[in-house]
């Protein structure tokens, strides 16, 4: 892979990003690597000066390590002697130039994006499971749990961001294409659009699942409207759109989709019986629960419009994942599979055995009730999880172990307090990626918003100890919910990923000790 300085200049001019350029010798200079991390720079590299924490010393280090050109929003004396491309927006420039450097791998992939406050990961895994039936296992995945870029073990690895930085994204796409992948399913976060990580990408299918206040704070979105605006950009940049008609702010969501997509290519779905008098458009697909228990979920999907009838996906589906809320996630994914050319038979077969690390994983016990590990990490997902458990159990005592991350998602904390007050009998407030904040302060902030006449609380910062205490006190008819971390095998503490056994591993160890 390589890119010439001349090509960079032409691309930046085409998108009206180039403010000025300083070419040292010839525009035909070839760069053989690209990087935004000075520690990873190789000889003949193009270096991007980006990020709120960028320091000129990083450019000095990049130059010493072999960078011959840099892209930045202002010139730096540290770059003297290097080719300089000064741009209006370095994040957008990095996305465009990275795509070109990796020879536009998106053009060789059927590209699918999911956005929403909750359900992105589950929906993405459901769709991958089905598409693998279509293409023989050649579906790449970029999610907040795992990235899967090929069939070999080394092609599957833990993700660090829901949506990678643009340079990493296009590198991953190129790797997927070179590995024979034909489809890519990815979660698209609001930050991906706010920080231009997916700038220039057009998706074959774009999904909008739901929206509720989240990711609002100093380091994220200044307010809900900014959060919503960034979420909506996926629909603006998709050829076909699939929308949950039950979402809040539906009128805004649908309007965003129609700015670039013909209504004939916009598909709506909702639960059977859902009616919204303000909904001016017909719902295309309906789904209805058949049977939900603590082993599997069954539901039916029916077509309800002329364009929906063209997709042969109606029928009964079985999920190995519990939770009636997963019917919503599955329905959207099935519609996507139908639009990708799949039939009911292949969809039903592909989705039936999908499981997701850290999503609705259960541990059954003899004397300590049901233990559930789930990534539920905001008010909406917490409420959905606890309410499902109360419907499934006659008179359960719901015990929750949960914390809130530091340095981000500050707006989630009141939501935790409200959901625990509404549905939990007892909550163990504990550590969950505190970052540079004090975990005790985070827990006390959540605790201050809880009505203790409805929900008893204990603050135990040692997450492993909190899990052990919660399980130990649970009776045979109780439910213990371990929320927020899912399958994470680390705690983010003061900039370091500190090893952590994982909620499901700890839960199994505790039960083994208690019931041996």
Swiss-Prot record:
UDP-N-acetyl-alpha-D-muramoyl-L-alanyl-D-glutamate binds at residues 38, 162-163, 189, 197. The modification N6-carboxylysine is found at residue 231. Signal peptide: none annotated. GO terms for cellular component: cytoplasm. ATP binds at residues 116-122. It comes from the Bacteria. Pfam families: Mur_ligase_C (PF02875), Mur_ligase_M (PF08245). InterPro entries: Mur-like_cat_sf, Mur_ligase_C, Mur_ligase_C_dom_sf, Mur_ligase_cen, MurE/MurF_N, UDP-N-AcMur-Glu-dNH2Pim_ligase. Pathway: Cell wall biogenesis; peptidoglycan biosynthesis. GO terms for biological process: cell division; cell wall organization; peptidoglycan biosynthetic process; regulation of cell shape. Catalyzes the addition of an amino acid to the nucleotide precursor UDP-N-acetylmuramoyl-L-alanyl-D-glutamate (UMAG) in the biosynthesis of bacterial cell-wall peptidoglycan. Belongs to the MurCDEF family. MurE subfamily. This is UDP-N-acetylmuramyl-tripeptide synthetase. The lineage of its organism: Bacteria, Bacillati, Bacillota, Bacilli, Lactobacillales.
């Amino acid at each position: 892979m390589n890119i010439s300085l001349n090509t960079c200049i032409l691309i930046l001019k085409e998108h009206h990003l180039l403010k000025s350029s300083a070419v040292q010798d010839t525009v035909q200079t070839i760069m053989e690597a690209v990087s935004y991390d000075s520690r990873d720079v190789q000889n003949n590299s193009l270096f991007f000066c980006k990020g709120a924490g960028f320091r000129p010393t990083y450019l000095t280090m990049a130059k010493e390590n072999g960078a011959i050109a840099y892209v930045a929003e202002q010139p730096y004396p540290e770059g003297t002697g290097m080719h300089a491309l000064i741009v209006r927006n370095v994040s957008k420039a990095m996305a465009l130039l990275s795509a070109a450097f990796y020879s536009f791998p998106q053009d060789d992939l059927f590209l699918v994006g999911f956005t929403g406050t909750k359900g992105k990961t589950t929906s993405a895994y459901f769709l991958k499971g089905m598409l693998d039936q279509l293409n023989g296992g050649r579906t790449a995945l970029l999610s907040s749990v795992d990235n899967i870029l090929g069939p070999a073990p080394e092609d599957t690895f833990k993700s660090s961001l829901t949506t990678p930085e643009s340079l990493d994204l296009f590198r991953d796409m190129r790797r997927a294409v070179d590995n024979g992948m034909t489809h890519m399913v990815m979660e698209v976060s609001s930050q991906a659009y706010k920080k231009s990580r997916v700038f220039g990408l057009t998706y074959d299918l774009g999904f909008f699942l739901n929206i509720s206040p989240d990711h609002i704070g100093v380091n994220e979105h200044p307010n809900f409207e900014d959060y919503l605006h960034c979420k909506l950009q996926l629909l603006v940049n998709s050829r076909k759109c699939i929308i949950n008609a039950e979402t809040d702010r539906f009128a805004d969501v649908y309007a965003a989709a129609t700015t670039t997509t013909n209504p004939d290519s916009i598909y709506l779905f909702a639960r059977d019986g859902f009616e919204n008098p303000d909904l001016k458009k017909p719902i295309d697909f309906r789904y209805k629960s058949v049977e939900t228990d603590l082993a599997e979920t069954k539901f039916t999907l029916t077509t309800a419009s002329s364009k929906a009838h063209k997709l042969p996906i109606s029928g009964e589906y079985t999920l190995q994942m519990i939770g009636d809320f997963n019917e919503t996630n599955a329905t959207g994914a099935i519609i996507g599979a139908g639009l990708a050319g799949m039939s009911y038979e292949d969809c039903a077969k592909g989705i039936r055995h999908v499981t997701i690390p850290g999503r609705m994983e259960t541990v059954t016990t003899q004397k300590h009730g049901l233990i559930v590990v789930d990534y539920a990490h905001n008010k909406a997902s917490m409420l959905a999880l606890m309410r499902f458990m109360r419907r499934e159990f006659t008179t359960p005592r719901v015990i929750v172990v949960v914390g809130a991350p530091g340095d981000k998602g500050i707006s989630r904390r009141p939501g935790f307090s409200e959901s625990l007050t509404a549905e939990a009998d007892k909550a163990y407030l504990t550590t969950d990626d505190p970052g540079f904040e004090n975990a005790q302060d985070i827990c006390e902030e959540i605790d201050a918003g809880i009505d203790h006449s409805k929900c008893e609380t204990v603050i135990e910062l040692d997450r492993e100890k909190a899990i052990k205490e919660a399980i130990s006190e649970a009776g045979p008819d109780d439910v213990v919910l371990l929320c927020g971390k899912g399958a994470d095998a680390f705690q983010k503490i003061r900039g370091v990923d500190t090893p952590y056994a994982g909620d499901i591993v700890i839960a199994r160890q505790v039960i083994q000790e208690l019931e041996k």
